[in-house]
Amino acid sequence: MPEAFKGIKQVGVIGWGSQAPAQAQNLRDSFASAGMDTKVVIGLRPDSPSCAEARAVGFTEETGTLGEVFDVISKSDMVILLISDAAQAKLYPRILAAMKPGATLGLSHGFLLGVMQNDGVDFRKDINVVLVAPKGMGPSVRRLYEQGKSVNGAGINASFAVHQDATGTASDIAVGWAIAVGAPFAFCTTLESEYKR
């Protein structure tokens, strides 16, 4: 896993819905157990009621692991976008504009591609675009990840896709992300297939 995330110092997890709490905690735990110093930072609106929930599981402003959405995006080498579909449709131009060149955009659903195709726009060419879609609800992704610490093979399977590889490392990042969130098996798909299902 350290090789898959080589050069990624910060992963920004944007949102705190069903998938975000599970994926953020699983990533943080996986990075720690692999001896990696990659930081997982949650990006939320400052007035979001979800800030209290993120703080309750150890993501805080004091530790630099909780911040404002666009500040987190601009500082992250990988941005995992786990906000609602409506928020993605509204905010994607600002989100993409805020990302660093060479960063990786991670999605857990293909919805954004459909929105962008409908709008007649494409992803920036200087970023990676990958998908990891766990095949279960967020709470089960976390519960089975924790169970997997003592029961070999426990976890939620996931699909993964590489939609755009700007750096030559997008495949490694996608597979590493799937492993880090606890998928015992990951199967290849496309971003388009994930939103047309």
Where are these regions (language model features)?
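NAD(P)+-binding Rossmann beta1-loop-alpha1 motif at the extreme N-terminus of oxidoreductases
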Residues: 1-62
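Structural signal for hydrophobic packing residues in well-ordered secondary-structure cores
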Residues: 31, 87, 96-99, 174-185
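Rossmann-like NAD(P)-binding element
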Residues: 45-46, 55-114, 122-137, 146
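Short beta->alpha junction loops/turns
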Residues: 16, 47, 84-85, 163
